[in-house]
Every structure is written in structure tokens, then in C-alpha cells.
């Protein structure tokens, strides 16, 4: 039979509150609303379906403080200790939210999905408290270092107050992707019962799986006469990870490689914190709630990589040690992850610590795999499966098929528009991909017709962010994007780059058209500079608004010195050096 839930009872609030659904939905219409962030949405889903049992809501100050300091919920019903729970699950709000929504002890507020405005639950406020973010970072993540993605999120995104309180469920968040693979804990437990699975080894992953992972999980199952639950995270993972759509297709391609009836794939809508040892204990609690009896804990489990000093945030086996420390209370058996390596001589995988000294081995690192995908180089069958590689190649085409964005920045009349048009023609002549031209003045009127020539600095920043969004989407689709706004501020250019690199695939190049103001004014046949100096136009860059010259442009050019064909040729050479054309 499946493992008992953490705390003894599965807190399936969706089932518990089903009889109240209509009345709760009607009440929600009259309440103030909190629209959840993506992390809060993931957290709420696992609160509602029992994945976070024994939680029944967002932590109050007593539970929060206890979790941060002791990895346990606050003691209850006369017990000396509370249940093990290593990660604080909190709902953050601002002072403005508190004032606007009338948040206070006993108040009720609707929690809504920002994607469709659906009311998911009603929270009854038990308390409002100000967390010590430095302490939370030090205790939970191990360091107050913004190189850690969760510390950066805590410092930059989390608001100044937390609201604690139990929730009543109205409905779970709606998903339209991979619906047959999404199970609540109760549903997955019922599935195990139907299949008569008594022992289940759960495998946590946020990366694509290859032959080594398959061999590891099969080995773990056979040693324990158990079945395998492949339970990948499809909520929030580490920034830069492979998107979950690609990963799930890769998992589906992998599943037929398992012996018939051995393994099952289910998706977990978890927002990871990358908290290493604490995260491993948390993952064990969650898998216990989903019915698993065993849980694989890897080397540097859920580690975020390097800190600001270039060292790992956690030791390689800290996670395994912390799970072992709580093993009696967790009541889920840890399976230590031993890295697997390929032995060409015997055509098999073995744990690295079992390979005789001097035996030839072969491995492909994540960096090498990405390089092979980028260049189109072969990926050997001993490393992965044909179906998995096919999925990855479709999502990560080689460089000549990838999109890219070139941002030309400079003063009005610096020549950037002329260069952009000439570059567009050159790339279209090559015919390898679609080419999109985003000129600043044209895009400004298209994206916001109410904005005229005399726009404020903040409007300029917002306008470039909008152009960045368009550029990122086009780049992601494989287009060549040439953007030529003035882009006068460094922070705006960095925001633009972040959008393209984060969403568009990372192929971004900055060209500074450094033609000086005197020359730009001299050739200004439209009289914009003259009008600005006469006070007829406000905030014209270079006259009464600053232009911050970029310091690290990929190319700097000046139309007084360089011809347009020479500049275009230089840009093409940059693209060729990156194997993009």
C-alpha cells in the first residue's frame, strides 16, 4: 500500500470543501482579491491538493519562525515538536495591499489565478507579520547571497509583509498542458493502488533524462523490488533550465525504454527554491504525500550552482546527510544517488564508486551536450535515446537555425535607421531566415499611439521594454531581429537584453552608432534638434535628455568615419563568427 501522508492525514482541501463550493464561490465575488504570483500559484495548488500536507494554508508567524529556525512547524496539541517541514510557505503582501484590501486578523480575501481571474480559494487572515529577510536567506538558503536565485527573488520580488491563514478551496488552478499526466496526491495514490504497487521509488528531476538516469532508476527499483515514479517539476525551476514543454516531451520519449509496467510518469507543479539540503527534505515530504515509499536524493540535490565567490552553495552530500538526520520522522526511505558512468568495454552503466580503478569510462557533460545541440554534432546512442535527442534538437536547433536580435542604439540622425535597413536587405538576400525590422519611431507609434515625439524618460524606458518583448518573441521563433530605437539609458538596454536572452534564446548583439551630436544636428533635415533647442520639443535625447553611451557594445561605429556597407559587413562578420549566418 502507499506510504501514509506526512502528519498522518492527507489534507486534500479540494475534497474537504467540495460541499461548500457554490457558497464559497458566491462569497468570493463580494471579497477583495489577491492575484497570485506564479510562485504563490504553485504553492497554493499543492496546499489545496494535499501535496504540502499537513499545511492547510499559508504559514502564520509562529509556524514561519519555527520552520526557519528549526525545520519544523510549531508544536501543536501539547507535542514537544511540530512536524518536519523545512521550507516556509508564505503569502507576501505590501503595505499598500494591506491598506487597500483591508487585511487584518479575521478578514477574508479571495485568492485568484492571474491567468483567468478564477477564484481558487478564500483565505481567512490569522496574522500579518514582517519577516526578517536576511535571517530567512541565511537559515533557509544557507547564505544571504543574491547569486542564489531564491535569495535574489526574496530580495527583489517578495513584498515586505507575510499574511498567514488557513484557506478554503474553491477549485484547483486550470491547466491545459499535459492534463493526463497531472495527478493530485489522492489520484496518484489511487493509481498505485489500482496497479497494486506496494513500493514506489520516486525520482525528482528538473532536467531532461538520458540513459544514465534510466539505468539509475531501474537499478534502484530492482534492488528494492519496487516500481518507479518519474516525478519531474513543471512549476518554477532554476532560471535557464530547459522549458517544461520540451522536458515532458523528452520524458515521454524515454518512458518506453523502461521494462513494461515498471515506471509511471506524473508531473509536479512545484515552485522550487533550489535550497539544497532543506529542499531535499521538502521533496521527500512531498513525495511521501504523493504515496512514494522511497525517494532518490542526488549529489548536490537541488543546488543552485556557484555563490558570488565562485564556490558551491552546498557540499555535495549535505542533502543526503540532512535527509538521513530526519529519516525516522519522514518515514520515507532515502535512496542515495550515485552518479552513473558509461563503460565502453562492457557497454553498460555503473555507479562511479563501483568502477574498478583504471577502467575506461565515458561521459558527456551538460555543457558538452548543449554544445553538440548548438552545433548539430552527433550525440551517441550510449548517452541518450533517439527519441529524446530528437525532442531536444527540435527545441534547440543548431546555431544557423536560431534567431538573434541586433540592437542598434544611438542619437536621432546618427544613421542607425539607415544601417538597420541596409542590414535587413543583406540578411533577406541571404534568405536563411525571416528578418524583422523594428525602428524606434515607427514602433513607438504602433505600440502606443498616444505617445508622441516628446516623451518622458520613463515612457522611453517602457517603450524599449515593449520593443524588447516583441524582439524576444520573434527571436524565440527563429527570426533575425534588427531593432533601432534610440535606447538612451543603460538600464533600459539591460532590460531589453534580459528579455531577449531570457526568452529569445540568448543571441543578442549591441551596436553603438556613436555618430556625435554635432554631426547629427548638421544633417537633421526634419529640424527636430532645432525645435528642441527652441523649446518646442521636450526630452529630445542629446539636447535636454541624456544619452548614456554603452561601455560594452559588440561593435562601435561612426558614420563620419565608416560607410554603411562597411558597418553592415562588420555586423555580418560578428554573426558569422557565432555561426549564425
From Swiss-Prot:
Q: Where in the cell is it found?
A: Cytoplasm
Which Pfam family is an annotated match for this chain, by its short name?
Answer: PUA_2
Q: Name one GO cellular component term.
A: cytoplasm
Give the matching InterPro entries: APS_kinase (IPR002891), ATP-Sase_PUA-like_dom (IPR025980), P-loop_NTPase (IPR027417), PUA-like_sf (IPR015947), Rossmann-like_a/b/a_fold (IPR014729), Sulf_adenylyltr_euk (IPR027535), Sulf_AdTrans/APS_kinase (IPR050512), Sulfurylase_cat_dom (IPR024951)
Q: What is this protein called?
A: Sulfate adenylyltransferase
Give the catalysed reaction(s), semicolon-separated.
sulfate + ATP + H(+) = adenosine 5'-phosphosulfate + diphosphate
Q: What lineage, starting at the top, does this entry show?
A: Eukaryota, Fungi, Dikarya, Basidiomycota, Agaricomycotina
Q: What is known of its domains?
A: The adenylyl-sulfate kinase (APS kinase) is non-functional. It is involved in allosteric regulation by PAPS. PAPS binding induces a large rotational rearrangement of domains lowering the substrate affinity of the enzyme.
Amino acid at each position: 500500500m502507499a506510504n501514509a501522508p506526512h502528519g498522518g492525514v492527507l489534507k486534500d482541501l479540494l475534497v474537504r470543501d467540495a460541499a461548500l463550493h457554490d457558497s464559497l464561490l458566491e462569497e468570493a465575488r463580494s471579497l477583495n482579491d489577491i492575484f497570485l504570483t506564479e510562485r504563490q500559484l504553485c504553492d497554493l495548488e499543492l496546499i489545496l491538493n494535499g501535496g504540502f500536507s499537513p499545511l492547510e494554508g499559508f504559514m502564520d508567524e509562529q509556524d514561519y519562525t519555527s520552520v526557519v529556525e528549526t525545520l519544523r512547524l510549531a508544536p501543536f496539541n501539547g507535542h514537544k515538536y511540530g512536524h518536519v517541514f523545512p521550507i516556509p510557505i508564505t503569502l507576501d503582501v505590501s503595505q499598500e495591499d494591506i491598506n487597500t484590501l483591508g487585511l487584518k486578523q479575521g478578514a477574508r480575501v479571495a485568492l485568484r489565478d492571474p491567468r483567468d481571474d478564477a477564484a481558487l480559494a478564500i483565505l481567512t487572515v490569522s496574522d500579518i507579520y514582517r519577516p526578517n529577510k536576511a535571517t530567512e536567506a541565511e537559515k533557509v538558503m544557507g547564505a544571504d547571497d543574491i547569486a542564489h536565485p531564491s535569495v535574489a527573488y526574496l530580495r527583489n520580488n517578495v513584498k515586505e509583509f507575510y499574511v498567514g491563514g488557513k484557506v478554503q478551496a474553491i477549485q484547483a488552478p486550470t491547466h491545459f498542458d499535459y492534463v493526463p499526466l497531472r495527478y493530485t496526491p489522492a489520484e496518484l495514490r489511487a493509481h498505485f493502488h489500482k496497479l497494486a504497487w506496494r513500493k514506489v521509488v520516486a525520482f525528482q528531476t528538473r532536467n531532461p533524462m538520458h540513459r544514465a538516469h534510466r539505468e539509475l532508476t531501474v537499478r534502484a527499483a530492482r534492488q528494492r523490488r519496487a516500481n518507479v515514479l518519474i516525478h519531474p517539476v513543471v512549476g518554477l525551476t532554476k532560471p535557464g533550465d530547459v522549458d517544461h514543454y520540451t522536458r515532458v516531451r523528452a520524458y515521454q520519449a524515454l518512458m518506453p525504454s523502461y521494462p513494461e509496467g515498471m515506471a509511471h510518469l506524473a508531473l509536479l507543479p512545484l515552485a522550487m527554491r533550489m535550497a539544497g539540503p532543506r529542499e531535499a527534505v521538502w521533496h521527500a515530504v512531498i513525495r511521501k504525500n504523493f504515496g512514494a515509499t522511497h525517494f532518490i536524493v542526488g549529489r548536490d540535490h537541488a543546488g543552485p550552482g556557484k555563490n558570488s565567490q565562485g564556490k558551491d552553495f552546498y557540499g555535495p552530500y549535505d542533502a543526503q546527510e540532512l535527509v538521513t538526520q530526519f529519516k525516522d520522522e519522514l518515514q520515507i526511505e532515502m535512496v542515495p544517488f550515485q552518479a552513473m558512468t558509461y563503460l565502453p568495454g562492457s557497454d553498460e552503466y555503473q555507479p562511479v564508486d563501483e568502477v574498478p580503478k583504471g577502467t575506461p569510462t565515458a561521459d558527456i557533460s551538460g555543457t558538452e551536450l548543449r554544445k553538440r545541440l548548438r552545433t548539430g554534432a552527433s550525440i551517441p546512442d550510449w548517452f541518450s535515446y533517439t527519441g529524446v535527442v530528437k525532442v531536444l534538437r527540435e527545441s534547440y536547433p543548431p546555431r544557423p537555425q536560431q534567431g538573434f536580435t541586433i540592437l542598434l542604439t544611438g542619437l536621432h540622425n546618427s544613421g542607425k535607421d539607415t544601417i538597420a535597413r541596409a542590414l535587413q536587405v543583406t540578411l533577406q538576400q541571404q534568405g536563411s531566415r525571416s528578418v524583422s525590422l523594428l525602428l524606434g519611431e515607427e514602433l513607438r507609434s504602433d505600440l502606443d499611439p498616444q505617445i508622441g515625439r516628446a516623451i518622458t524618460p520613463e515612457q522611453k524606458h517602457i517603450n524599449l521594454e515593449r520593443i524588447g518583448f516583441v524582439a524576444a518573441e520573434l527571436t524565440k521563433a527563429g527570426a533575425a531581429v534588427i531593432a533601432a530605437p534610440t535606447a538612451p539609458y543603460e538600464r533600459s538596454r539591460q532590460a531589453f537584453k534580459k528579455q531577449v536572452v531570457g526568452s529569445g534564446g540568448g543571441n543578442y548583439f549591441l551596436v553603438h552608432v556613436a555618430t556625435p551630436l554635432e554631426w547629427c544636428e548638421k544633417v537633421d533635415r526634419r529640424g527636430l534638434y532645432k525645435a528642441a533647442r527652441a523649446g518646442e520639443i521636450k526630452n529630445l535625447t542629446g539636447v535636454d535628455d541624456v544619452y548614456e553611451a554603452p561601455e560594452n557594445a559588440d561593435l562601435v561605429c561612426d558614420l563620419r568615419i565608416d560607410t554603411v556597407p562597411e558597418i553592415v559587413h562588420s555586423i555580418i562578420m560578428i554573426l558569422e563568427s557565432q555561426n549564425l549566418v
